[in-house]
A protein has these predicted regions:
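N-terminal Rossmann-like NAD(P)+-binding domain of SDR-like oxidoreductases, especially those catalyzing
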Residues: 1-191
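Active-site proximal helix/loop that lines the substrate pocket
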Residues: 99-105, 141-144, 194-200, 226, ...
Length: 328
């Protein structure tokens, strides 16, 4: 299967590209390398972690190169360039991953966030329609739901997002469905939550907890630690995406792809301190972040055969060991 990964040099994309290649598929990565990636990080390389983040993005690129996965330096905001690239390769499936994947940064710079989220999405959808792609997979977010109305929700929960990031993800879902309805483009929407794993540089919560524990001997929690997230190890998400790409029953469907069990920030912090002894500090809550909880994965289990493998404890242990090896 030939798969085009738009924004594929990012955290999720490079893991997905490597998994596709490992099983014999033909992935091609298209990325401008300007959002949460090498080019943007080089501009602010002062301090320990910005330098390490640059090294992580370089490792991503090296891994793609070592596995002979083409990395095309292409800005998906440029419709003409993107259409030429995809028309030449004619992928069977297109996966749209491009975004400014950070709630606070999205609220501070809505114009850039719109450009890299919706403009790239519309371009990719229209090129997919034009070349007759067999499947278009859109990478949405739990933030599209807005504040969860109950501790556990499924895919029928209404979309009532707060802030720029979640609103653009929800808007993207409506645009995807419009192309599905108007043009018959087979589409699949994936909603993840609280991802973590090697070579993440986008400031996700587990990344931040581990890095401040390593660097400062402290973990800082927003609020009292009772807020919950459905923490999901990156390889579980990748497994879910692969199942969705493979299964014809996933066409024109939306799936929660998570662990399926929310845990509190305090539980996460205590899990990190078990491996990295440090202090836990509590601070003010961030009102821009919606309340979340468990995202039920019954649909993905039933239709796709999805079964997450990583508990929070095992996933964090592996992630911390990766940091130790990377920094050695």
């Amino acid at each position: 299967m030939k798969v085009a990964l738009i924004g594929g040099a990012g955290f999720v994309g490079h893991h997905l590209a490597l998994a596709l290649k490992a099983r014999g598929d033909d992935p091609v990565v298209y990325d401008s390398l300007t959002v949460n990636n090498f080019c943007s990080l080089v501009e602010k390389s002062e301090g320990r972690w910005p330098r390490e983040w640059i090294n992580m993005t370089v490792e991503r690129i090296n891994l793609l190169h070592d596995k002979k996965i083409p990395l095309i330096h292409c800005d998906a905001r440029d419709y003409h360039r993107l259409s030429l690239e995809l028309a030449a390769r004619r992928p069977d499936s297109i996966v749209h991953l491009a975004a400014v994947a950070h709630i606070d940064r999205s609220n501070k710079d809505p114009q850039t966030t719109f450009d890299h989220s919706l403009r790239t999405l519309e371009n990719a959808l229209d090129v997919g329609r034009a070349i007759g792609a067999g499947r278009f997979l859109y990478f949405s977010s739990s933030t599209a739901y807005g504040p969860f109305q109950s501790p556990e929700i499924d895919e029928t929960h209404p979309l009532q997002p707060q802030g720029v990031y979640g609103s653009l993800k929800a808007a993207g879902e409506y645009i995807v469905r419009a192309y599905q309805t108007a043009y018959g483009l087979p589409c699949t929407i994936i909603r993840p939550q609280a991802l973590y794993g090697p070579r993440c540089v986008s400031g996700r919560v587990i990344q931040k907890f581990i890095e401040t524990a390593l660097d400062q001997g402290v973990i800082r929690i927003e609020g009292d630690g009772s807020a919950v997230h459905d923490f999901t190890e990156i390889s579980d998400l990748v497994d879910g995406i692969l199942l969705a790409l493979d299964n014809p029953r996933a066409a024109n469907e939306t799936f929660n792809i998570t662990t399926g069990q929310a845990r509190s920030l305090m539980a996460l912090a205590l899990t990190v301190t078990f491996h990295l002894p440090c202090q836990i500090e509590k601070g003010p809550e961030n009102p821009e972040k919606p309340s979340r909880g468990t995202m039920k994965i019954d649909k993905a289990k039933a239709l796709l055969g999805y079964e997450p493998k990583w508990t929070l404890e095992d996933g964090v242990e592996r992630y911390i060991q990766w940091y130790r090896d990377f920094l050695a």
